[in-house]
Amino acid sequence: MRARLTAVHVLPSPNIWQWPELYAVENRAQDSTGEIWRALRAECDWRGLDVVDVGCGDGFHLPVFAQDAASVTGVEPHPPLVERAKARTRDVDNIRVHEGGAQRLPLSDGCADLVHARTAYFFGPGCEPGLTEADRVLRPGGALAIVDLDGAAPPYGRWLCDDVRGYDPVAVQRFFDEQGFSTVRIATVWRFERRADLEAVLRIEFAAKVAERAIAETAGTEIPVGYRLHVRRKPTGIILL
């Protein structure tokens, strides 16, 4: 058994690190009909199991897992968000939150049945150190579940591709295919209480030009947003090379 505590380089999140209160509004709007949770449950049910949420932010998703998991551990590299996550979950007995990055999880070998990451770190090529760490902390048969935005699903995916120079959703999908993941595409709706909240969220998600175009192309208080759920299980037996 060993724990990884070595410091690693962490890229700042362009939204939740700078605007945590507004990102909380975004979190509440996302997946308004629960499609991601249903797909995740179908692919890797966590009832009675030990769950790790990598890049847990302010802990928004931790209580959902904790409702029927044996234990839930949130790992987050940004100290202010670690404190927010601890405050959010202080009264939930089976949740723990640690400071750390995906490349060096502060956890022991074989301590988890499910490692979950939602729009955090695992964005395609370059995340291999995190994949290795997830395998290290997973027990045999455990699952790594990565929820990421689907850059091929309009309208949000089109805005994403226009905003992030060099982003290629086909190449991202090829990467996860080659790494042995299965993929489920999920159609969701972000539903905001106020139009002003929708516009403010788009302005923290995209650079000004793309944000204003996205606002102009969106009527009302809802945005269709596609996701991809990538799942890979750790082998249970001896691997012959």
Describe these PLM feature segments.
Residues V52, G57-R104:
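Class I SAM-dependent methyltransferase SAM/SAH-binding core
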Residues E128-P140:
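A short glycine-rich, Lys/Arg-flanked "PGG" loop and its adjoining helix->strand segment in the class I
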Residues D113-C127:
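A short SAM/SAH-binding and catalytic strip from SAM-dependent methyltransferases
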Residues Q103-L114:
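A short acidic, Gly/Pro-enriched loop at the edge of an enzyme's catalytic core
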Residues M1-R47, F60-V64, A143-R174, E205:
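Conserved class I S-adenosyl-L-methionine
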Residues G48-L49, G110:
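Nucleotide donor/acceptor-binding cores
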Residues D58, D177, S182-L241:
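Conserved Class I S-adenosyl-L-methionine
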